[in-house]
Amino acid sequence: MIKIPRGTQDILPDQSRKWRYIEAKLDELMELYNYKEIRTPIFESTDLFARGVGDSTDVVQKEMYTFKDKGDRSITLRPEGTAAVVRSYIENKMQGDPNQPIKLYYNGPMFRYERKQKGRYRQFNQFGVEAIGAQDPSIDAEILAMVMHIYQSFGLKHLKLVINSVGDFDSRKEYNKALIEHFEPVIDTFCNDCQARLYTNPMRILDCKVDRDKEAVKTAPRITDYLNEESKEYFNQVKQYLDDLNIPYVEDPNLVRGLDYYTHTAFELMIDSPDYDGAITTLCGGGRYNGLLELLDGPKQTGIGFALSIERLLLALEEEGIEIEEDEHLDLFIVTMGEKADRYAVNLLNDLRHHGIKADKDYLKRKIKGQMKQANRVGAEYTIVIGEQELEDGNIDIKHMDSGETDSIHLADLVSYFENKKEKQGEK
């Protein structure tokens, strides 16, 4: 038997209903904030991620699915969404659109060769938001407010917004020098990843998860001491907006994001819930990227965004015992007796469905009792039984499955019966 590739999953019908609910809710929220959907290819030129994400990052070094196509071009399955959206912004000359900033969101599969663990897959579905074309603390605050709004709208609590400023490029240059000076004397005792990062991306050492390295990280210089006046003022304004919005936050000077393109505001949303046995789990992350467009041969424009994993959102809802609203009922199940009635039901189903009525029938030649059981299994709200007598005189009894009440109507009035019910429900 051929099995599913390691690190992937089948999303079966009982789960896909939850996915549709989440995706529909996210779409509704994006309308409130005036963000428009963008769809980019699942694969891109490898150079896009090497340049846009950063050669020294774990994503590029270890996690990308890269291959040569038949034209001998190096192609990579997208490991994240921002670089592709920025590439599209540049290629489609969106900077010429007077409606700046361009507010975009995306939702789709991403691919990273990661170690399998709970809530993480090698093919995962990422929802992300990008606002490109404005460097203003108020839009940073809007993005942070949106992140909180998303998770709160699903009923999640125990949320902790963690923020930091990684400064502009000048600030980071000075800070990187200080980090190298701090870590150089002890770098031989660090893990291999940290040793490799010392001269390429020393800020990433601050994010090391190896216990023996954490002591040296605790005493490392803080970026807040190396921010220039412009970076300090920008971050202070972002925090002032959050205070005005009554959005609580925690500052963490060691918070750095895993990709090279971040500048100024960086953030993560965490959940600190008893349901996680005391563990703090990251739900979402993002930040500002002021040099990415120029790095990809684009205009001197700025952007900010975030991304979240649908899988991890589902896991958080499950861990906190939050049920997802489902409306998967079937309006009508048609029970048939005999071949003539079954043939009639095929035409009747077609007519019902064209009028927006969710309907189904038996396809396994079950007896009446078996068909009624099937109607219950599929959650039918109503059933009708059609046999020779019903076909002859055109009269049917429509039964409400929960109450057992029945109405006698003519077959020709079946569509209007449901349309009238829906009108009455709409008036309530």
Curated annotation (Swiss-Prot):
**What is the top-level taxon of the source organism?**
Bacteria
Keyword set includes Cytoplasm: yes
If you read the UniProt record, what top EC class would you report for this enzyme, in one word?
ligase
**Pfam families, per database record:** HGTP_anticodon, tRNA-synt_His
Any one of the GO BP annotations: histidyl-tRNA aminoacylation
Q: What InterPro entries would the database entry show?
A: aa-tRNA-synth_II, aa-tRNA-synth_II/BPL/LPL, Anticodon-bd, Anticodon-bd_dom_sf, His-tRNA-ligase, HisRS-like_core, HisRS/HisZ, HisRS_anticodon
Looking at the keywords, is Aminoacyl-tRNA synthetase present? yes
Q: Which GO terms describe its molecular function?
A: ATP binding; catalytic activity, acting on a protein; histidine-tRNA ligase activity; transferase activity
The enzyme's E.C. designation: 6.1.1.21
Q: What Gene Ontology cellular-component terms does the record carry?
A: cytoplasm
Gene3D superfamilies for the chain: Anticodon-binding domain, Bira Bifunctional Protein, Domain 2
Catalytic activity annotation: tRNA(His) + L-histidine + ATP = L-histidyl-tRNA(His) + AMP + diphosphate + H(+)
Q: Which UniProt keywords apply?
A: Aminoacyl-tRNA synthetase, ATP-binding, Cytoplasm, Ligase, Nucleotide-binding, Protein biosynthesis
Report the locations given in the UniProt record: Cytoplasm
Query: Per its UniProt record, what HAMAP family does this chain match?
Result: His_tRNA_synth (MF_00127)
Report the sequence similarity comment from the record. Answer: Belongs to the class-II aminoacyl-tRNA synthetase family.
How is the subunit organization of this protein annotated in UniProt?
A: Homodimer.
Q: Output this protein's name.
A: Histidine--tRNA ligase
Report the source organism. Answer: Staphylococcus carnosus (strain TM300)
What would be the name of the gene that encodes this protein?
hisS
